[in-house]
Structures are given as C-alpha cells and as structure tokens.
Amino acid sequence: MAAEDFLTIFLDDDESWNETLNMSGYDYSGNFSLEVSVCEMTTVVPYTWNVGILSLIFLINVLGNGLVTYIFCKHRSRAGAIDILLLGICLNSLCLSISLLAEVLMFLFPNIISTGLCRLEIFFYYLYVYLDIFSVVCVSLVRYLLVAYSTRSWPKKQSLGWVLTSAALLIALVLSGDACRHRSRVVDPVSKQAMCYENAGNMTADWRLHVRTVSVTAGFLLPLALLILFYALTWCVVRRTKLQARRKVRGVIVAVVLLFFVFCFPYHVLNLLDTLLRRRWIRDSCYTRGLINVGLAVTSLLQALYSAVVPLIYSCLGSLFRQRMYGLFQSLRQSFMSGATT
C-alpha cells in the first residue's frame, strides 16, 4: 500500500495526482507528484496499532453478529418483521468483516493486491455503508407502523420485513456496484508500491468526486431525513395515544437515534465537509484539510466499531433475539456453574 498507517499527506493540487485511499472508509489522503510541496503530514494511528484495532473489530464483528445470526436461523419460524430487519443489519455487518479482512491482508501482504481484491474490498465497504443506514431507516419505518397500527397484525409479519430488507439490499447493491466500477490496482509513482485506486482515465478526479457526492447524499442526507421523519411521526403518535408500552417505545426511539448520532453522525458530517472542500464550496487550506482528514481517520474507526457492537444492542429491541439470547446466556451460566461444582 502507498500508506502503511493513518498518514495524511497534503500536497499542492495543481500539478499533482489527487488521491484519497479510501480503504473501508479509512481515508488516506495524499496527492502524488514528482514536483510537489508538502503542506503537512500527520500520523493519526501507528501502523501496528491500526492493524491491531482492525483485527479486534473484525473478531468482535464476526463473533457478535455470528451469534445473533445463529439464534435467528435456529428460531426463524418465530421471527417478526423487526427481527428480519435486525438480521439484515447483522449480516450486513458481516459484509464489513469481509472488507476489513481484505484491508488487513493488503496491509500485511502488499504483493497480493489485485484489481479483483481492490474491488471486493471497496464493494463490501460501500455495501455496508448503504445497506446499514437503509436497514436502520426500515427499522424506524416498521417501528412507526407498529405504533400507528398497533391493532393490526400485518406490520408484525415476516413478509413486511423481507420486502423492506430486499428493497434496502437492492438499493445498496446498485450503489455499491456503481462505486467500485473503476477501482483497480495501480502503482504509486513515488513509492513504487501497489495500491488500490479509482482509475477512470482523464475522468478519475471527477469520478472520485461523483462517488463521494453519492455517498454523502444517498448514504447520509437522504437516510437521515427519513429517520427524522419516521421517528418524529412515531413520537407524535405515542404522545397522542395511551399505549401501555409508551415509555418503552420512547426509550427505543431515544436509544436508536442516540447510537446513530454517537457512532455514525460524526463521520458522515466530516465526509460531507470533505466533499464540500473538494468541490471548493468551502475555503481550502492545509489546516482545514488536516483537521478533516484526522477526524475522518478517527471517526471511521468509530463507525467500524458501530458495526461490531450495535447489532448486539439492536438485538435487544427484537423479542426473538432478546428472549433467545437471554435463554442462551442462562444455559451457559448453568453449565458453567454445574461444571464448577463438580
């Protein structure tokens, strides 16, 4: 790889090869040219720490989401619409595991870098980005339907969950396939190392800007607007009705929104600012670039951690997962206690 740790190298734009190595959302911004002046170089996370953090997130992701997926498959006949959507979120987080695994392998073994591996890594990353947020939107929609039509049975059926999950998956597949079209293996003209880069010929800069713009609009602004709409509608319905589970519904709304804003919102805001900077809609400077790119490096790790931890938290919102996970932990506890006494 051209960057072996979270390095942010800023060079002049006029006669340089503008580059941002977006590996699973971890932005390594650098502009390569034979005659350039370096503005600033900031080390955010050392190489060994970087690999260790990604590996830890990978393990937590696989174990946690694998456990939830196992519980669903074992008791899928009892699943409702929310449970189907939560399963989609867990499986989607496993997609990020594939991207993280490919990224770590390319860090450790640069010789294996190929166009196919580059496209695989970025495809599963964008699939995670789009499918995750649209799945959360679908969860908010089902929550609204369950509250607004609490006397009806159709919002609880599996068929609604499968329809919404399929729709979110279709949108994510189209957007992810578009994002990885020009991803390929190239050689850094300075370090002579292989790396993954969007290679669209003379249109490379425009293409990269297009990908980032679509990511900001379709992966953040539109879903955020839908989240606000559905949870606002749910809140209004809860306030004007006398639901027995009124306090519980409010708690779910606060929990889901709070988790999204803590783990994902900072990265998306910085990604939006970075896109505006590249479009020259805000004033460009080395200081501004430094702040944005350091922030992107840190918040992208937070977003990756979200994929590993939040599905387990979301599992508590679905009755199937909550009851079965509680039963599983009780069985493990009893087995441990009986083994300790013998």
Swiss-Prot record:
Membrane topology, Extracellular segments: 1-51, 114-121, 181-217, 273-293
Membrane topology annotation: Multi-pass membrane protein
Residue ranges crossing the lipid bilayer per the database entry: 52-72, 93-113, 122-142, 160-180, 218-238, 252-272, 294-314
Superkingdom of the source species: Viruses
Location of this chain's protein in the cell: Host cell membrane
UniProt KW keywords: G-protein coupled receptor, Glycoprotein, Host cell membrane, Host membrane, Membrane, Receptor, Transducer, Transmembrane, Transmembrane helix
Cytoplasmic side: 73-92, 143-159, 239-251, 315-342
Function per UniProt: Receptor that signals constitutively via several signaling pathways including PI3K/AKT as well as mitogen- and stress-activated/MAP kinases. Promotes host cell proliferation and survival, modulates cell migration, stimulates angiogenesis, and recruits inflammatory cells, both in expressing cells and in neighboring cells. Maintains chronic activation of NF-kappa-B via interaction with host CADM1.
Name the record gives this protein: viral G-protein coupled receptor
